[in-house]
């Protein structure tokens, strides 16, 4: 069964989080640039240049978003350049944004890596006359941006609990593997999950533990939690790397019968689902987020009406639908 949570055009994107966030930064890590896409003729784009700054380079969520951006750019006749730091960290993302501001594109699509730390560099872009669209993650103060486009992350967290609840009708203990505090999207997913747990007295939440976006750390958390509390019936991994690590932790613990629901649907997560280590994946719509980001930027540049907040939906991928056209379409891409 494919369960799609419908997106709505005026949702609260303040609840968004990274498609996948990355581990704390090494100052030596630099940006990974992707060649510009010289878009073919299209309608409504003019000769605009759009910069896309990913949350982190090499992450299938942001790669899939980049694909959507490039597809929209080709259709609308604009040029797109993509950059991203090697780790999900504002100290690495800030100099990339500073360099983008110096290059003076017409618009900037960006997934902020921190709700407060990225406000200053993004404000600098706004002050320079660059139209800014926030994609995936957001800011504590998003004033001055054209639009915020993100998944309904609170709803996605609740949907993750629904999957665990359905597999464990008698209830039990559940655990959340988050990324780190202060990331808008993953915080919202945990919030939605915890709120849903609280509505069913048969379940007890063991709270949120943070993996710092490191699969190895997520594996350690899961292995340790299962050793300390064998009554755990379900684990919610709040992003791609947490899900990858949770699957590893389950294997290392040698425990069966645990329902693991992962957020995001990269190749490793799909393989874990097919192997039976993970029972469900909450797949976002990163390509759709990217396409809508381009559309909102161009609308603003053309003096047309824009939407300040847009929420996109989800598809729940399970063993039953992973090999169907719907399941394959929902899985993330490793390249465009």
List the predicted regions and their residue ranges.
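A residue-level marker of the well-folded mature domains of exported/periplasmic proteins
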Residues: 8-336
């Amino acid at each position: 069964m494919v369960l799609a949570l419908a997106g709505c055009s005026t949702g609260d994107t303040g609840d968004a989080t990274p498609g996948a966030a990355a581990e704390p930064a090494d100052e030596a890590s630099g940006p990974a640039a992707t060649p510009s896409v010289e878009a073919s003729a299209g309608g409504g784009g003019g000769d605009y240049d759009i910069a896309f700054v990913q949350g982190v380079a090499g992450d299938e969520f942001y790669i899939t978003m980049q694909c959507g951006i490039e597809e929209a750019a080709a259709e609308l006749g604009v040029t797109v350049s993509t950059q991203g730091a090697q780790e999900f960290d504002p100290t690495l993302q800030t100099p990339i944004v500073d360099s983008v501001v110096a290059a003076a594109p017409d618009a900037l699509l960006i997934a902020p890596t921190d709700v407060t730390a990225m406000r200053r560099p993004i404000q600098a872009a706004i002050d320079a006359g660059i139209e800014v669209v926030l994609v995936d993650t957001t800011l504590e103060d998003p004033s001055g941006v054209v639009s915020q486009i993100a998944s309904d992350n609170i709803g996605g967290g609740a949907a993750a609990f629904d999957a665990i609840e359905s597999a464990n009708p008698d209830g039990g203990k559940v655990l959340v593997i988050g990324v780190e505090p202060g990331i808008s999207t993953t915080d919202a997913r945990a919030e939605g999950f915890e709120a849903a747990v609280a509505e069913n007295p048969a379940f007890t939440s063991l709270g949120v533990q943070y993996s710092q976006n490191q699969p190895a750390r997520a594996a350690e958390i899961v292995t340790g939690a299962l050793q300390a509390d064998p009554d755990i019936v379900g684990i919610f991994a709040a992003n791609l790397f947490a899900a990858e690590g949770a699957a590893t932790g389950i294997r290392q613990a040698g425990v069966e019968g645990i329902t693991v629901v992962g957020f995001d649907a990269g190749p490793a997560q799909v393989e874990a689902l097919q192997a039976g280590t993970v029972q469900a994946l909450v797949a976002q719509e990163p390509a759709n987020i990217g396409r809508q980001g381009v559309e909102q930027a161009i609308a603003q540049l053309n003096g047309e009406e824009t939407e300040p907040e847009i929420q996109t939906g989800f598809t729940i991928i399970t063993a039953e639908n992973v090999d169907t056209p719907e399941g394959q379409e929902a899985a993330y891409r490793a390249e465009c």
